[in-house]
């Protein structure tokens, strides 16, 4: 048996021969996904604080005070106007002479001026009540100039109406107290005391309401001029 000097090729049994023309298989290891970051805690939501708005702020403190005074004066004017209307409407008086068959009546509706006076005071009292909500709105919103203009115009109309009615009633009451010698009109208050007392008190109360309304007009005009 011949031996050669060439080294013998040793093929290990455990090795797997590479496939011809194919890339070697590479074991792919799937990388584990990175751990999810811990969820951030929700941001603390702070509810907006309710800031208290003072009723009398420095910017509109004067306007609110004037508007509040306007509301109080309307309530003050309502009383005399209503009292004048009620006193005039209930001023009827009957005078009996000798027997019940001869009676003399003094009624306010016999005088057109007193009838106009009672109606005007009733209208003024109703207007003052209806104007209270509008005046309250002006207290809450002093910048409502349009509403102030509306109240000013209505106050002027009611003041003019009430002034005319009170002046006419004052002339009739003076005639009832003093009479007129040139016209041979005798005074009737010597006989009808209740009628004259009620109508005289009604005239005084009506003039008080007129003064309050005139003060309201002056106050509103001054406020509007100041804000404009």
Curated annotation (Swiss-Prot):
Role according to the record: Regulates membrane-cell wall junctions and localized cell wall deposition. Required for establishment of the Casparian strip membrane domain (CSD) and the subsequent formation of Casparian strips, a cell wall modification of the root endodermis that determines an apoplastic barrier between the intraorganismal apoplasm and the extraorganismal apoplasm and prevents lateral diffusion.
Keywords (A to Z) from UniProt? Cell membrane, Cell wall biogenesis/degradation, Membrane, Transmembrane, Transmembrane helix
The UniProt entry, under Pfam families, shows: CASP_dom
Q: Which residues lie on this side of the membrane: Cytoplasmic?
A: 1-65, 135-149, 223-228
The membrane spanning regions, by residue number, are 66-86, 114-134, 150-170, 202-222
Q: Which GO terms describe its cellular component?
A: plasma membrane
Q: Which residues lie on this side of the membrane: Extracellular?
A: 87-113, 171-201
Q: How does it sit in the membrane?
A: Multi-pass membrane protein
Q: How does it assemble?
A: Homodimer and heterodimers.
Which cell locations does it reside in?
Cell membrane
Q: What name does this protein carry?
A: Casparian strip membrane protein 2
Q: What is its main location?
A: membrane
Q: Give the organism's phylogenetic lineage.
A: Eukaryota, Viridiplantae, Streptophyta, Embryophyta, Tracheophyta
